[in-house]
């Protein structure tokens, strides 16, 4: 009690004295310590009060050799000092019961100006005041600089005489000794000791080793933790690392210091890297907070700090956020992306469900960790269908919490009128019934007009019908089905009408469908009908027969798109094609039907289907291989059978090539016609790009952090980078061709000729992710025909696809073969990113495919057709070059639909005639886009040929890729592949190599382009022919002269 009173009195006395002192301080330096002594000698067990005041807040620091900058706490129960903030600018440091351990330099720092004042305190040993004592240094190291260095041999009594000696030679060193700091001298890289002498007693200090260290201009500290979010009981490690300096001292500010016990450990990682570690084997909630690491380099007095925030949870959590509305409306065939952002710890399990059942089939699910506790999951529905509407739920769980997000998806189907009929009811009533379908449920409005001729051009003359008890009644009913909603509306006229009635339906603003029906009175109607029946019965029958024949002839028929050119006119604008019916068929292609085991349907169209099958006995090296079998439907007409037979003859005469879907065998006898071709397990290129788009974007999102690899506005084209391409087996997703959600039904092969029923074959689900070993055991894989095994879709892959398609088209052009439907949907992906060109029209419902537009009895892919094909019905290999440019646009937009800004109606033609061309895709380099523009030259003679395109695209590829392609091609041609083996006796294809000028820009046409790519066109083609290793001849096709370009 007396001690406390005395201390308060001393503090009051010092405060009054200090106030008087500060009243006279200048504006330059107001920081003062009272008492104003540079050093104080205290008796052991005594007390001391030091008051520091300035013009702003002041703090007390302890300066020592081991901890050059250690901020003292305001209060501490386990230490013999206390700091009291007497006012906003003054603080008092009180020491009591001091001993030799309190020997140190105490610093007062003004926060606003950074000014420092210090006082040295010495406490000699009370029991033996004359005893020599050095303050031990924990490291015994001295850093050498260009000037003086300080050996920190600090004593507890300033009266001790201290001398510095070289430990090895025992020779004294000249210098200056400061009791509170140590011995200052010019030192070498040696070991030194201090000797103290007092009243005849001599004692040596510990040894100090002098080191030379690299001192950077400034230092940076980096703090990281094993986890910034964790649960209590889990281990926690916090590291503070400093690089580029050889020696640095660490100190930590940690949360809840009174509760959390810590003992930092310093580790030297390398000659210029040090780390301080805090290790807590079992973290608690008290460990939550901000950890601040202070690093100090004492040679140049450089300081740095860094911090990290740690959160220790009592239990785990899950928090979710959807990035779009949860009630979603999508148009038919639109791609829908459902995205959920998640914060969770521990790491969550994420599952998607549709209407309570696990999601499977043609949906792409991405789960990506974006931060330590942040995740994102994306469910993508590609080309959404009506049956895919419903509730999609993302279920996120971990061991402590469960959350879910549900999206209600409605697939919008444009309203259309399905049926409009009128009936005469008893009592001279008339009933008009209109049936409309759509999603959301469409509305129906009724209108009438007395003059049909006038109303056709004057929509304002139509009068809306409303229910009237005396004239008419309107009754409407709605039926909701799984795929679409149906509305049935009926108008009943109570009196005979002689008018035109219109049914109009809509379910979207501005989009209306309507139909008209003309009503006549019942009496007049009966007379007209009777007279018509009597007078025109026979003519009607005759006309009906004629109409049926005409309709039957106009009905779209299956036809092979590929055409083989026989001859061309001198001006290059008239072509004669070979009639495939006149080509012979070699029975060597025949295979027994019982060697085929049919499986699931890969694709189905209006005319036929393609079925997966297992073929036995086609190859000597494999007992069975997986194949695709083309066949017609049971309703096929003779002309369609002839078309499929023509396709067989053309494919058999073309010969094998690595980049076309090759013919393997055929069954033409004793049953339906089968074409057995290669099986491409990853489907068409459009779906492949859609399904792997996320790997492309994620790959370059990761790489952008290092070298900005993704092609965009001003970035460096990837074509200028020679990247490494590895080769192995494909494993990027396992997607099947043309597959659906329904389970597959496998159909065994039967020897029942025409009695086989294929209607039961159902579309298959997508295969599970690729498993190479299993696939090879089934006989479907060829490990020596693999281009790339990269699981991600890269820019090099896009170039590789373009290159392989150009190689395949170069082969077809060399055979005078025009594809006429070159598009990404007709390019299939096989094992190892091997690309093959095909004509998949048989298994595609082109009558309901928006990519094909009806014209007469055929359907045309307008967006991919060259102008001369659209407007003049002229098809050449150069019109295929135009289509190749569109295919490049598809590839480098990752599966985009061409001409997204143009409608598919009569407005499509005008921009094309005016020279409209699509803009550069986001992922295409300038070189690739330049090739596209060359392919889209309006004058077809000026377009490059495929040999030139192979050269251009090949120049953008790495040498390793082209070398691997050549090795794969050579392996293919030397293998016992069924397509190669069946043509080896002939040594070549029956079609000749095209005339060097055919189907390519002549020298006159190319002279308009002073581009080095357009030189030596014949040389490119000749080199390509040598690489293919196939000598061509053909007795059916006459040589084709050079086309002459039009003169301007």
From Swiss-Prot:
The modification Phosphotyrosine is found at residues 558, 575, 577, 735, 746, 758, 766, 770, 852, 1036. It comes from the Eukaryota. Disulfide bonds join 52-108, 153-194, 240-293, 434-503. Its main location: membrane. One of its GO terms (molecular function) is platelet-derived growth factor binding. Glycans are attached at residues 87, 159, 224, 239, 309, 327, 457. Interacts with homodimeric PDGFB and PDGFD, and with heterodimers formed by PDGFA and PDGFB. Monomer in the absence of bound ligand. Interaction with homodimeric PDGFB, heterodimers formed by PDGFA and PDGFB or homodimeric PDGFD, leads to receptor dimerization, where both PDGFRA homodimers and heterodimers with PDGFRB are observed. This is Platelet-derived growth factor receptor beta. It comes from Takifugu rubripes.
């Amino acid at each position: 009690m007396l001690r406390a009173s005395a201390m308060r009195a001393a503090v009051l006395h010092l405060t009054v004295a200090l106030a008087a002192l500060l009243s006279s301080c200048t504006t330059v330096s107001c920081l003062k310590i009272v008492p104003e002594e540079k050093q104080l000698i205290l008796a052991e067990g005594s007390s001391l009060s030091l008051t520091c005041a300035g013009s702003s807040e002041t703090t007390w620091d302890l300066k020592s050799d081991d901890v050059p900058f250690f901020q003292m706490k305001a209060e501490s129960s386990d230490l013999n000092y206390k700091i009291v903030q007497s006012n906003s600018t003054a603080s008092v440091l009180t020491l009591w019961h001091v001993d030799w351990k309190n020997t140190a330099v105490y610093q007062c720092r003004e926060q606003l100006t950074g000014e420092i004042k210090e006082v040295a305190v010495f406490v000699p040993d009370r029991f033996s005041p004359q005893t020599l004592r050095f303050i031990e240094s924990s490291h015994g190291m001295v850093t050498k600089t260009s000037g003086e260095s300080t050996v920190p041999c600090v004593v507890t009594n300033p009266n001790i005489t201290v001398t510095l000696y070289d430990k090895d030679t025992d020779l004294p060193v000249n210098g200056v000794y400061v009791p509170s700091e140590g011995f200052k001298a010019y030192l070498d890289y040696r070991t030194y000791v201090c000797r103290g002498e007092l009243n005849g007693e001599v004692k040596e200090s510990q040894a100090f080793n002098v080191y030379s260290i690299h001192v950077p201009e400034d230092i940076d500290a980096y703090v990281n933790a094993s986890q910034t979010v964790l649960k209590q009981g889990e281990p926690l490690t916090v590291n503070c690392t400093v690089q580029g300096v050889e020696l640095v001292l660490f100190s930590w500010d940690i949360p809840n210091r009174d509760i959390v016990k810590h003992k930092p450990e310093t580790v030297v990682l390398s000659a210029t890297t040090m780390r301080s570690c805090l290790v807590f084997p079992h973290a608690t909630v008290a460990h939550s907070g901000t950890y601040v690491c202070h690093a100090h380099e004492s040679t140049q007095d450089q300081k740095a700090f860094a911090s990290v925030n740690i959160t220790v949870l009592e239990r785990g959590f899950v928090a979710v956020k959807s990035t779009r509305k949860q009630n979603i409306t999508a148009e038919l065939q639109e791609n829908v992306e459902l995205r959920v952002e998640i914060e969770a710890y521990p790491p969550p399990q994420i599952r998607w469900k549709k209407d309570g059942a696990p999601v499977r089939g043609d949906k792409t699910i991405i789960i990506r960790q974006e931060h330590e506790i942040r995740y994102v999951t994306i469910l993508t529905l590609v080309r959404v269908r009506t049956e895919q509407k419903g509730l999609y739920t993302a279920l996120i769980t971990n061991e402590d919490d469960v959350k879910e997000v549900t999206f209600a998806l409605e697939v919008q189907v444009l309203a259309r009128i399905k049926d409009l009929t009128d009936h005469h009811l008893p009592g001279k009533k008339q009933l008009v019934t209109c049936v409309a379908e759509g999603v959301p449920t469409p509305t129906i409005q009724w209108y009438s007009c007395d003059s049909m001729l006038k109303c056709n051009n004057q929509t304002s003359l139509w009068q809306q019908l409303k229910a009237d008890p005396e004239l008419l009644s309107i009754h409407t009913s709605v039926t909701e089905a799984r795929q679409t909603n149906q509305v049935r509306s009926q108008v009943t006229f109570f009196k005979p009408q002689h008018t035109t009635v219109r049914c109009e339906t809509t379910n979207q603003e501005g989009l209306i469908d309507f139909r008209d029906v003309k009503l006549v009175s019942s009496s007049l109607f009966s007379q007209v009908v009777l007279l018509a029946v009597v007078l025109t019965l026979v003519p009607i029958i005759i006309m009906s027969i004629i109409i049926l024949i005409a309709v039957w002839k106009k009905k779209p028929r299956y036809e092979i798109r590929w055409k083989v050119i026989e001859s061309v006119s001198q001006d290059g604008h008239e072509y004669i094609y070979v009639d495939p019916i006149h080509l012979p068929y070699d029975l060597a292609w025949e295979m027994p039907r019982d060697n085929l085991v049919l499986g699931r349907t890969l694709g189905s169209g209006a005319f036929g289907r393609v079925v997966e099958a297992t073929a036995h006995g086609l190859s000597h090296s494999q007992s069975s291989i997986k194949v695709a079998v083309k066949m017609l439907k049971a309703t096929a007409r003779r002309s369609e059978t002839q078309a499929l037979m023509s396709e067989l003859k053309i494919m058999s005469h073309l010969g094998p090539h690595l980049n076309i879907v090759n013919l393997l065998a055929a069954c033409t006898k004793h049953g339906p016609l089968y074409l057995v071709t290669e099986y491409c397990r990853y489907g068409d290129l459009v779906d492949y790009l859609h399904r792997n788009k996320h790997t492309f974007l994620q790959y370059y999102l990761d790489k952008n952090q290092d070298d900005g690899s993704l092609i965009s506005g001003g970035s460096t084209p990837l074509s200028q980078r020679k990247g490494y391409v590895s080769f192995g087996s494909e494993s990027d997703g396992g997607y099947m061709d043309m597959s659906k959600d329904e389970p597959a039904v496998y159909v065994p092969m039967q020897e029942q000729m025409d009695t086989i029923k294929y209607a039961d074959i159902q579309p298959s689900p997508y295969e599970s992710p690729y498993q190479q070993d299993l696939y090879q055991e089934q006989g479907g894989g060829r490990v020596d025909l693999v281009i790339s095994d990269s699981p991600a879709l890269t820019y090099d892959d896009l170039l590789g696809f373009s290159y392989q398609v150009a190689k395949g088209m170069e082969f077809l052009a060399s055979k005078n073969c025009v594809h006429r439907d070159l598009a990404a949907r007709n390019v299939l992906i096989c094992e190892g990113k091997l690309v093959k060109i095909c004509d998949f029209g048989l298994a595609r419902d082109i009558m309901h495919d928006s990519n094909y537009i009806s014209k007469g009895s055929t359907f045309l892919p307008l967006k991919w057709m060259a102008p001369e094909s659209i407007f003049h019905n002229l098809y050449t290999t150069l019109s295929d070059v135009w289509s190749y440019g569109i295919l490049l646009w598809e590839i480098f937009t990752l599966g985009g639909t061409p001409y997204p800004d143009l409608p598919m109606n009569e407005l499509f033609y005008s921009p094309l005639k005016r020279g409209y061309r699509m803009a550069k895709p986001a992922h295409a380099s300038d070189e690739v886009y330049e090739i596209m523009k060359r392919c889209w030259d309006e004058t077809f003679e000026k377009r490059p040929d495929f040999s030139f395109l192979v050269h251009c695209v090949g120049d953008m590829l790495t040498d390793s890729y082209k070398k691997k392609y050549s090795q794969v091609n050579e392996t293919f041609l030397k293998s016992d592949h069924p397509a190669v083996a069946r043509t080896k006796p002939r040594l070549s294809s029956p079609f000749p190599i095209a005339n060097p000028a055919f189907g390519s820009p002549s020298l006159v046409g190319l002279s308009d382009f002073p581009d080095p790519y357009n030189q030596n066109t014949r040389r490119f083609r000749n080199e390509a022919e040598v690489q293919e290793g196939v000598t061509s001849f053909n007795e059916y096709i006459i040589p084709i002269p050079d086309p002459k370009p039009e003169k301007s």
